[in-house]
Amino acid sequence: MADLKTNLLGFTMNSPIIGASGTVGYGVEYEELADFSRIGGISGKGLTLHGQYGNKGERLWETPSGLINSIGLQNPGVQHFIDVELGEMLELKQKYGTVAIANLGGHSEEEYVEGAAMLSESGVDIVELNISCPNVKVGGMAYGVKAEAAGEVVRMVRDACKKHLMVKLSPQAENIPEMCRAVEAAGADAISLTNTFQACAIDLEKRRPVFDNIFAGLSGPAVRPIALRMVWQAVGAVSIPVVGLGGIATGKDALEFIMAGATAVQVGAANFANPRAMETIAEEMAAWMDAHGVKTLDEIRGCAR
């Protein structure tokens, strides 16, 4: 029987499958739908220092091979998360061993630092620093394009945060390997990539862009080969763990990222199509491994390089 256990930053996870931020709430919403013993961790809904309502107008738009979203980081704020939602995540961890990851966005360096400092004193296992959100007008992806800007904000957060720090990168980065090296040098413990790809949709009946911000984030199967290429580049550029995400919907998809060198993977849009997607992906990975005589993921991690 294949063993999917995965070590990420010292945490032994049930599997390499992590629920991507913004697609599984804080985990508890999925508890009755999925077998959490198959899930390695949950990255909670993206947080900002102060709660915000998110974007107005249309927020989701399906494409033939994916989903475009413009949520705009709607969230209750860091303090509310610490007081309420984090407790639910930690209960899941106690029951199933799922690693609790807090995804932190921001509109300025100061907001990132203050939010990270608050999370540093909480019970979260990992802080996922989101410098790559394409759906907010200020901050967010502004730090995810240029390596110098990314390195600076990561360095400031590193000084304020005692937790393991995973930096979530944008596919819009000018140079993926350079960006990865910059955040590693600034103190990142791990990298997750890639966030959604900036996209656009037109409503033919209204004869105008679907989203008020015009551009929004594309995820789903359409982006997977590009995300895989970026993960390949990242693994070759740094010595810290790389968590791959982008269009993973099957066990074979996840195994491609593992063979490219990813330590773990995140599953996002697939959760909207199938609430049991993470569990199913883990089962499919194990079935493939059993069929090919592979006992652990370490035997094939990075084997394609």
Language-model segments: residues:
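Surface-exposed amphipathic alpha-helices with a cationic face
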Residues: 7, 11, 82-95, 120, ...
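Short gly/pro/ser/thr-enriched loop/turn and capping motifs at secondary-structure boundaries
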Residues: 48-53, 133-136, 198-201, 272-274
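C-terminal helical cap(s) of enzyme catalytic domains, especially alpha/beta-barrels
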Residues: 54-64, 202-216, 258, 270-295
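Small/polar glycine-rich anion-binding or flexible loop at a beta-alpha turn
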Residues: 248-252, 274, 305
